[in-house]
Amino acid sequence: MAQQQSEIRYLTPPSVDVKKKKYCRFKKSGIKYIDYKDPEFLKKFLNEQGKILPRRITGTSLKFQRRIAQAVKRARHLALLPFVTDMMK
C-alpha cells in the first residue's frame, strides 16, 4: 500500500506570537514580606469570585505565590477578605 503524506493547509497562516516574559513583581521591587493586613494589595491576586489567581496569570514565582496564598488565607480567617463573593472588584 502506498502511504500518502497528508498536508495541512490553513486558510490563514498560523502566527507565532512573541509574548512578553512574565516577571515576579516581588523580586523586581525587592519585597520580602507580604502583609496579610493589607486587603487592597491582596485583591490584585484574586479574581471576581474571590479565588486566588494562578502563577501563570500573575507571573509570580513559586516562593511568592505560596506567600500570597498564605496571606490571603490569613486575611480570610480574620474576615479582612471574603471567602466567596459574586462580584468582588
From Swiss-Prot:
Keywords linked to the UniProt accession? Ribonucleoprotein, Ribosomal protein, RNA-binding, rRNA-binding
Could you tell me which Pfam families the record lists for this protein? Ribosomal_S18
Extract one GO BP annotation from the record. translation
Q: Which residues form a coiled coil?
A: none
> Which Gene3D superfamilies does the entry link to?
Ribosomal protein S18 (4.10.640.10)
Q: Which GO terms describe its cellular component?
A: cytosolic small ribosomal subunit
One GO MF term, please?
small ribosomal subunit rRNA binding
Give the residue spans that cross the bilayer. none
Record PANTHER family:
30S RIBOSOMAL PROTEIN S18, SMALL RIBOSOMAL SUBUNIT PROTEIN BS18M
Regarding protein family, the annotation reads:
Belongs to the bacterial ribosomal protein bS18 family.
- Subunit structure comment from the entry: Part of the 30S ribosomal subunit. Forms a tight heterodimer with protein bS6.
Q: What does this protein do?
A: Binds as a heterodimer with protein bS6 to the central domain of the 16S rRNA, where it helps stabilize the platform of the 30S subunit.
Protein name per Swiss-Prot or TrEMBL: Small ribosomal subunit protein bS18
Q: Please report the organism this UniProt entry assigns to the protein.
A: Phocaeicola vulgatus (strain ATCC 8482 / DSM 1447 / JCM 5826 / CCUG 4940 / NBRC 14291 / NCTC 11154) (Bacteroides vulgatus)
What gene is it encoded by?
rpsR
